[in-house]
């Protein structure tokens, strides 16, 4: 659902960039106020894992694919402010290194995927968890519904931006984007629930209540588990991800505005590959690009969080 350059008009680009900057600024302030320094590696790990997971497109109906957004996963495990920071790091990296999402459309993508999606996920998760209870079943129910709602919210926000830009009629694009992402959102929900279920059993302190939670101990083990899973995804799964168009690309092809997409700058690692390695091994080219991206995502998110974190704080507000 990454909006490329060329889809949105100047007014929409400017307004979404302003809203995204406002949301990110508030999130950075919250992180500065409430993030314990010992949780910094988890933000880097979340960014790296979400980057790796977003490389894995899964097929859905009507020749379309989807991939994990990861906003709900980050919101559940990190809280909304830290989730916004981690998601923004991923989107910035994807735009600059992989041309996945336009440079001029970065504000729109950050607003949709890094601000709206985590905030909706957190609100839904908190509300459902209060109703369903803090048992594992209640947590997973809240997680799944929050993940589905976050995907729908991001899709409808994107649809509104396309309509506001005059690309396609409001009713047409809202129905098309909403319809396809209702299905993609189910995949988002299932994948997020599975990951949270594993985390809740292995590291239950990471699935914190929606208010205040004690900072988890032994972060080295959590980071090691997450890093191993991220590497496994890139090595074993990423090269076999679906090549079908994602929801936005499918809608663009269906309604004839796919040709409007332009690249504001060439990608350093086009199509998530290290080009010199493609001839020797396409699999290795994809794995190498994924590894580079995951490391950079970890480094960017870790650096920002480390600069903002509060030394000595032992609790984190979700």
Task: Show the residue positions of the predicted features.
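Alpha-helical membrane segments and adjacent membrane-interface helices in multi-pass membrane proteins
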Residues: 58-117
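Interfacial loop-to-helix junctions that mark the boundaries of transmembrane helices
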Residues: 1-13, 36, 60-65, 105-108, ...
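Short helix-perturbing small/polar motifs within transmembrane alpha-helices
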Residues: 112-154, 158
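Individual transmembrane alpha-helix segments
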Residues: 1, 270-303
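Hydrophobic transmembrane alpha-helices
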Residues: 2-9, 14-73
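Hydrophobic core segments of alpha-helical transmembrane domains in multi-pass membrane transport
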Residues: 16-29, 49-54, 119-122, 147-159, ...
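Membrane-water interface at loop-to-transmembrane-helix junctions
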Residues: 141-145, 176-179, 212-229
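Juxtamembrane non-transmembrane "cap" segments at the membrane-aqueous interface
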Residues: 156, 243-274
């Amino acid at each position: 659902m990454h909006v490329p350059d060329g889809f949105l008009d100047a007014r929409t680009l400017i307004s979404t960039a302003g809203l995204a900057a406002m949301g990110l600024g508030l999130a950075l302030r919250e992180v500065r106020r409430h993030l314990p320094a010992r949780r910094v590696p988890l933000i880097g790990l979340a960014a790296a894992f979400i980057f790796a997971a977003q490389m894995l497109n899964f097929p859905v109906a009507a020749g379309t694919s989807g991939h994990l957004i990861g906003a709900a996963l980050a919101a559940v495990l990190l809280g909304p402010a830290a989730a916004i920071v981690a998601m923004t790091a991923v989107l910035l990296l994807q735009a600059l290194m992989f041309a996945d999402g336009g440079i001029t459309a970065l504000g729109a993508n950050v607003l949709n995927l890094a601000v709206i999606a985590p905030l909706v996920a957190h609100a839904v998760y908190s509300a459902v968890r209060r109703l369903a209870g803090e048992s594992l079943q209640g947590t997973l129910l809240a997680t799944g519904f929050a993940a589905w709602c976050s995907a729908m919210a991001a899709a409808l926000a994107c649809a509104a931006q396309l309509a506001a830009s005059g690309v396609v009629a409001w009713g047409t694009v809202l129905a098309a984007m909403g319809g396809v992402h209702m299905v993609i959102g189910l995949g988002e929900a299932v994948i997020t629930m599975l990951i949270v279920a594993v985390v809740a059993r292995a590291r239950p302190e990471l699935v914190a209540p929606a208010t205040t939670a004690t900072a988890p101990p032994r972060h080295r083990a959590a980071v090691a588990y997450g890093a191993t899973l991220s590497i496994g995804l890139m090595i074993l799964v990423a090269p076999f991800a679906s090549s079908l168009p994602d929801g936005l690309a499918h809608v663009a092809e269906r309604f004839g505005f796919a040709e409007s997409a332009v690249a504001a700058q060439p990608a350093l690692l086009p199509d998530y590959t290290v080009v010199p390695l493609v001839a020797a091994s396409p699999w290795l080219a994809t794995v190498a690009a994924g590894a580079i991206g995951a490391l950079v995502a970890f480094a960017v998110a870790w650096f920002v969080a480390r600069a903002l974190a509060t030394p000595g704080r032992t609790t984190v507000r979700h």
